[in-house]
């Protein structure tokens, strides 16, 4: 059995195997009529990593969930001076022909997320780190210069 979801064969269910019985999904194939027989959840694979973007007084902080990936499999780039791009790829496993697969749910494939950074971003000082499947990207902000206020003595 292939590790790649079946796009033309529909579900992989064996009625004699209690571990392969799927629960009926009334929305299965709802978004992809006519394209394939594959459920929408199978073709989505690993297309998008979930990303949080928060702004602090000092920086823009991005956190991306990339479970199971090593830092060598993820790229963080700044394009065109203000586009933060986070991308990566999860490779598929080698399948053993002698194994009997009961369920294939983990996906493989590429993902890419792009964010337009605001003008106050210091793109030359971007830092990234990864821990426990969470990528953290910190983009420092340009410190706004506060207008200097000078008191003027009033004569008279």
From Swiss-Prot:
Source organism of the structure: Arabidopsis thaliana
Protein location: Cytoplasm
Keyword Nucleotide-binding: no
GO biological process, one term: cellular response to hypoxia
One Gene Ontology cellular component annotation held by this UniProt entry: cytoplasm
Protein biosynthesis among keywords: no
Residue ranges annotated for the sHSP domain, each copy included: 42-156
Assembly and interaction partners: May form oligomeric structures. Binds to AKR2A.
Expression triggers: Accumulates after heat shock.
Family of this protein: Belongs to the small heat shock protein (HSP20) family.
Descriptive protein name: 17.4 kDa class I heat shock protein
UniProt keyword list: Cytoplasm, Stress response
Entry-linked InterPro entries: A-crystallin/Hsp20_dom, CS_dom, HSP20-like_chaperone, Small_HSP
